[in-house]
Swiss-Prot record:
Binding site for substrate: S77, N129, E173, N180, Y204, Y256, V274
Keywords attached to this entry: Hydrolase
Assembly information from the UniProt record: Homotetramer.
GO MF annotation: an example: glutaminase activity
Paired cysteines (S-S): none
Similarity comment text for this entry: Belongs to the glutaminase family.
Protein name in UniProt: Glutaminase
Keyword hit for RNA-binding: no
């Protein structure tokens, strides 16, 4: 058995995988001091900057958990993947893509510069703030709770429970997010919002404030890896085409303005949030039979110390190492 290769059909192999991940979580946890926790949302700055945890759930039932896996944190921008999926299920993929494009921006996630200088002026993709706010306006319902109910129901089917809103995070975002309000007014002026602005922003702030764990993120990733079908029940929860577009967006746009580097060096669809979470999707692949998770897996990471792009600094390093050692890249 060579490093990075293991036969998962044996208990020894599973123990090796667990020991391997434990060792590298401990190694990268020592590098969390290179980043800083988010402070522009006041509630987030209370997170432990030294925390680091990972959960990997395979289609074959293998589960690897290491580090700070029991900590809850707000999902933040990772929820943009889910709101996009639900909007497409309700309104149709083609309609949603008339309102929001699928192009990377190369700009900060809360920038509006591309809206001002490009024609047409629609948001570049649903994973930046302008796109996610537009998508929130497209969700069916007259109130924020009505708009979010299908998203809650989808998560309940995926996870087996309904995540709760962290009220302190929600209030913190609602009361301090002047940039998102400015983006909202700009989108309203350009005619991209289909709901009242206050309801749209309330919806957006609420779905960004849902509490999750790394296990929750890994399970969401596993369903996406399986093209929207829950591997435990074989129930199709997300239409295949929508799941595939969502994964494509994660690969090209999911890591803010570091998406190109992440795609090049890690090579799997992923979406990060400023709370320190990362949702990653490993599709099935046909390669060396000794490699782990050939059937696909979902990965959830939490490390609130962020780099300059707003991504978990230790989480990205951990994912890059595991992806390289286990040949997880799509390419």
């Amino acid at each position: 058995m060579v490093q990075g290769s293991v036969n998962l059909n044996t208990e020894r192999g599973k123990e090796w995988l667990q020991d391997y991940v434990d060792n590298w979580v401990n190694f990268y946890q020592k590098q969390t001091d290179e980043g800083k926790v988010a402070s522009y949302i006041p509630r987030l700055e209370h997170a432990d900057p030294n925390a680091l945890g990972i959960s990997i759930i395979g289609k074959n039932g293998t589960v690897i958990r290491s580090g700070d896996t029991d900590l809850e944190f707000s999902i933040q921008s990772i929820s943009k993947v889910l709101s996009f999926i639900v909007a497409c299920m309700e309104r149709g993929l083609s309609y949603v893509l008339q309102r929001v494009d699928v192009e990377p921006t190369g700009e900060s996630f809360n920038s509006i510069m591309h809206l001002e200088i490009n024609q047409p002026k629609k948001p570049f993709n649903p994973l930046v703030n302008s796109g996610a706010i537009t998508v929130s306006s497209l969700l069916n319902g007259r109130t924020s709770d009505q708009k979010l109910e299908p998203l809650y129901q989808l998560l309940e089917k995926i996870l087996g429970h309904r995540p709760e809103i962290d009220v302190e995070v929600y209030v913190s975002e609602r009361d301090t997010s002047m940039r998102n309000r400015a983006i909202g007014y700009y989108l309203l002026e350009e005619g991209y919002l289909e709901s009242d602005l206050s309801i749209t922003l309330e919806t957006y702030f609420k779905h960004c404030s849902l509490n999750v764990t790394v296990d929750d993120l890994a399970m969401i990733g596993l369903v996406l890896s399986n093209d929207g079908v829950h591997p435990n029940t074989d129930e199709p929860l997300i239409p295949k085409q929508i799941a595939r577009v969502a994964k494509s967006l994660m690969l090209t746009c999911g890591m803010y303005d570091a998406s190109g580097k992440f795609a090049s060096y890690v090579g799997i669809p992923a979406k990060s949030g400023v709370s320190g979470g990362i949702l990653a999707v490993v599709p099935p692949r046909v390669r060396d039979q000794n490699l782990p998770f050939l059937e696909g897996c979902g990965i959830g990471v939490f490390g609130p110390a962020l780099d300059k792009q707003g991504n978990s600094i230790a989480g990205i390093k951990l994912l890059r190492h595991i992806a390289n050692q286990w040949d997880l890249s799509l390419f």
